[in-house]
Amino acid sequence: MNTEQLKTKLQTLDIFSGSIDLKFFEGFMSNDSYLASDDNNKYVVKIGGNREHYGVVNSHEVEASKAGYRAGISPKVIYNDDSILIFQYIDSNEITFEGIREKETLKRIVSLIKIIQKKVVNYLEGPNLSIELFQTIKNKITILKERNTPYADKFNNFVKDCELFERKYESHEIVFAHNDFYFKNILDDGKKLWLVDWEVSG
């Protein structure tokens, strides 16, 4: 869906009034998202839908996002269908790549992780995907090899490392997790941290 197609779709929704301006968010690796502004409000619009090659199921992302909102750490889902997700806009700054490594920031992120494991999971209402992390990694490596990636030779050691960690942690408790603490998925409004992009949670 290009920008003009997206704008046309948004104009059919009761959410927006007047002219709509779209600003593309740079730097996200697995999705396209826009800041959508009309005459009165701002929203974040994410191009959604199922993306099998990423293991993304739209209905799960919606439910996980709603659970995150109920737990107080994610923006509200305003609208969703099979092709787009619209979220409340949070006036905030992204955590930078350097900033995410700072000690105080890491403490705040650990607090977020605890909320996910102890609170967000209790607000899930729809089917909850079980993400088997190590198997997901192996599946993606298989896909990349089938597509003749130039990095195939480097995967062997990576697979061995995964198997080592898998053996080490196979007896640990399984908990609900966000699974994508990419620095652009963490927002700081000056008072607290917010999490977005629950597409690979489980």
What would you call each of these model-derived segments?
Residues 7-10, 38-42, 51, 86-91, ...:
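Short amphipathic alpha-helical segments, especially helix-boundary/capping motifs
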Residues 19, 73-75, 185:
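Short small/polar-residue motifs
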Residues 23-131, 136, 146-154, 171:
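ATP-binding pocket architecture of kinase catalytic cores
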